[in-house]
Amino acid sequence: PPAAWNGGRTVTGAVRREFIDFIIRQYNSRGIPIRYTFTNPLIKEIHLTDPFCNMITRIAENGLNEIIVNVPVLEDYIRKNYPRYPLISSTVKQIEDRDALLAELEKDYKLVVLDYNWNNRFDELETLPHKDKIEILVNPYCTPHCKRRKKHYEFLGERQFEHNLQVFGNEKQALKPIPKKEFPCPNMSFDFYDTTGFETHVSPQQIYEKYVPMGYENFKIEGRLMHPADILESYMYYMVKPEYRDMLRLKM
């Protein structure tokens, strides 16, 4: 927080440079890349010079860390100015057309995060090329084929700009309260297990019995800003055998 380029969720607050360095170091020392989610759909050329976004991009450019991109103007800027970053195509693009997806898979991306509406359409998934380049979003919180999803992403992007100005703007902007706005969506109050009833939900059994045998190997858990209990449950569900979950819950 509060990077203006951030998308998908509105991240508020502020963070010190020392803490950013600490987080990057802790992940990278274990061989784990950090992945910036620079997918704000409202980014224009005027936002490319944002000092905070360029600072955090510069200090993490080491060939290991990654960036998720959505808007071409920012993608081109990153490719030109920070060429060591592997880039990932965002699910925010909402690519449901097969021909458009095939074209996306041929581009120079490390991964393409599949639109969740492709999930569990096994006959079609079987025929897709470059399965090792596709990442599956396994627990989408959004309603399948939601007609307001694009507007919701734009609303969150606008809110991100407002929070960025409050932290980094001039004195007048910093003192100006952020207008109270809401995007009414019942899914915002869902917990992890509410999402398991969606047709787009991918269970651990499906991962191992369907997706992996097909050749898929990249899976993404949604919910980075959910309640810690929800995040914990999603990790338990996908990464811990059922007989060990209660024991680990107590230890964590």
Go through the PLM ranges and name each one:
Residues 1-101, 109-252:
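Active-site pocket-lining/capping segments in soluble small-molecule metabolic enzymes
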